[in-house]
């Protein structure tokens, strides 16, 4: 596709270093392709969790993406990540392709497992204390209400990810989820060595290492939002427990349970109602109006500058510079972009 063609007509995204994101990726037609499984011998013994960890570790260090929290649900996945170099688009492209291809081979699927859209990744920002839990919607956003000491938007989004199996009515606690869900303690740092899944990647594959290290931790930029790491854990655990209690009340303590989850076919599909055409936010500030106004202004300024550069390119001008944070037009087509803005001195 030539630059300026149909593929570039969608709203451009800006990727800036030092940004937190909530990442969501959904399976096509809400199919349960990521359903929790266990290695039971046979030709394909690697679990979906194993495939996720290998693919993530394979590209995370290269692109400077640091994983803070993860939950693999049956038909979608949630992550909270820190994008150190402004390359989250490249990371997601490479990681998701490898992960999807391995899962596709595992189940003998003729097509990919993820929806064709880029997925959802919300920029997280806003250090103002979050709204009361009663004022939260089902997706961790705020409906209003006064601030409390529950923590920052980052705290609440991490707790939302970790509580997902409970909120969905599947298990009574995150610890009971048979799939992969991280814990609050993982924010202090956790690393595991993951072997190359030989069922999907050849033993003599020079591009993919025999072993990679999958790591999780809160970066210093996250801990800096709190007095110290202990305060971060306390705030996150408190938010998580409030979400769990709220979900238990909502489901009247009736959950599907581990055995029923494990018995779910990877070829089954979710049948619950889902509204069609819901708008997907690109920023989440959770009630911090000052941060929201600033981010919206920055986003509009970026899109305006991008549009001006793109129109100049279409008009025949070849020496075009795109705004800082431009992704595809810079990384794929090689057009220069402005330098990243220098952070203000503290």
Give residue ranges: language-model regions.
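Short catalytic/metal-binding and nucleic-acid-binding patches
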Residues: 1-346
